[in-house]
Amino acid sequence: MRKTLRTLLVSVAVAAAGVLPVSTARAADGYDRCPDGYYCMFSGLDGTGDMIKLRGNAPDLAALGMDDRAKSDWNRTPSTIYLWSDAQYSGCTAVTSSGPTGKGNFFPTYQNFFSSVQFDGPGGPSCGTPPGEGR
C-alpha cells in the first residue's frame, strides 16, 4: 500500500511539473517602467531610481516626493511637457517633447531642479540651454 501511494504521489508531482507554466518574465526596469500614455520622471539617471507617472498637471512636485529630485524623464504622451523651476508653474521652463526625443537625462544643470509639471503649456520664460550642453 505504501509503495502504491508513493508511486501515485510521484506520478502526480511529475505530471503537475509538466503542466505548470514556468515564468521567465522579469519586471520592467529603467525607462521601461513608464507606461504608455504617461509622462514619467525618475530620481536617477537613465530612468533609474524613484519614479512618478503623470497624466495631467502637477503644480507642486513636493506633494509627489519629486521636488528638485528628477534627473531623467520620458514623455510617452502626445502632449508637450513644460517643466517649471518653481512650484505653481513659476520660474523658468524647459520643454520635453513627445516622441523619440522625449526620453533621456536632464542636462547636469537641470538635474534636481524642477518643481512643477504642466501639460501643453503655455510655458514661461525659457531656462535656456546651459553653455556646452547642447543635445
Where are the regions a protein language model picked out?
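Compact beta-sheet-dominated domain cores in extracellular/mature segments
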Residues: 2-11, 16-135
